[in-house]
């Protein structure tokens, strides 16, 4: 089928074109709202600025397709192959992208608000500046797992997104908006989250080993049983964070704000907390073996039964702190 025939039949009211072969065609700016192209072969096609809202493209072949600026709002794209496709500036609001292949796709500045990306493979995709606010990337019954390994998500808006259990190994999330995002049990080992806003995010049992969180906003986050070994948290704001049983051993947290944080039973062995603010924090039964707390502010902190025998407290402010033996430091 050629472009002329497709457009003529569509304009005549026909919408179902299941399994058609349209590889390499030029449909620049075409109005194809609600068209049914499931299973169609559109690889290498040009669909720049095309109107494809509510279109059915399930399991279609869109490898290398040019879709920059296209309108794909509420489109059915489950199982579609968009490997190496150009979706720069495309609008995919409320689109169904379950189990879609978006590997190496360009999604710069794309609108993915409220999109369903469960099980989608975004490995190596470039989502710089994309908006994923309210998007669903959650793991459901271990059947769906969003794959974002190595993806570029710099400055993206993921506020409120569900990324529970997502594979985010070595992902670039610099400056990203992750407020109120659910990252429970997500794999963020070696990820770059420098300057990201994670305020009020759910990070229970997240793996952030070796991650770069320098200058990140982590105010009021939930980090129960999280793994942060050898992570860089220099200058982070963890004020009021809920962090019982967290593993922060060998992490860099110098100059960080951990005031009012709950760090009960936390592993802070060999952690660098030089000049950090730990005022009014709970460190009950915390493990602080060979921890660097030089010049740190521990005023009014609760250190009941904490392990401090090899801790470096030179120049630390302990005024009003409850010491391991229960006495109040003057």
Per-region residue spans from a language model:
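Tandem repeat scaffolds
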Residues: 2-330
